[in-house]
Amino acid sequence: DGPFSDGATGDRYRALEGMNAVTRDEAEKALRAYFGNVSEIHFVQESSVPIEVYEFGLTAGGYSMSAAVTKQGGQVLYALSDADVSETNMTAEQLLDTARAFLLARGYGAMEMRYYSRYEGILTINYAAVQDGILLYPDLVKVQLSMADGAVIGVEAGNYLLNHAPRVLPAPSLTEEEAIARIGSQLTAIAVRLSVIPTAVSEALCYEIRATDGADTFLVYIDAATGAERELMQVVSDESGILVM
């Protein structure tokens, strides 16, 4: 997966605050609208793990899925398919555009693709929310698409619903140049941008510095307030996608 794809944990779903409760019928209607090509849907059960939801089984675009819709707000928490896709008729580049358009049309706002992986005929893409050009890694959405026909066959929006809200972010205490100086002489910076990353207890505004040692590429996260190195990850690119370790 991409950086911070595990996200943060908690019980306050910030993206749902202020939203009204929905009925089971309203949740089903929201799920139909979300996928748009639902040929069959049935209610499974109510659940409270990790949040109060209505669970459904459905078939959309010829793919069977299980899905959950939040009782508060009627938002899709997840939709998962066990489809076995072996045929590949579309490229990753084509599907990156498809997935971004899918999210935009469903009201997720400014999102940016960070990393993706391919397993057989299924492409999984991580998108992070963006606020004023700053990446919000806690507000992550994963989208799965069939490379056979471009259908969206999976969504994991739990991190997004848990964390997404406008932030009041402090101005960095360090400049980009000062942050780059913290990564050490063995690495050469390629690109720098501000990002919010999850921590054990909260979040931190960091400079995300993409850097290389001449052979490998790394992501170094320098705390924009203290200058401390928060994270160091290696970027791996191959035929399966772009991942971090």
Protein language model regions, located:
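Long, terminal "pre-/pro-" and other extracytoplasmic accessory regions
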Residues: 1-245
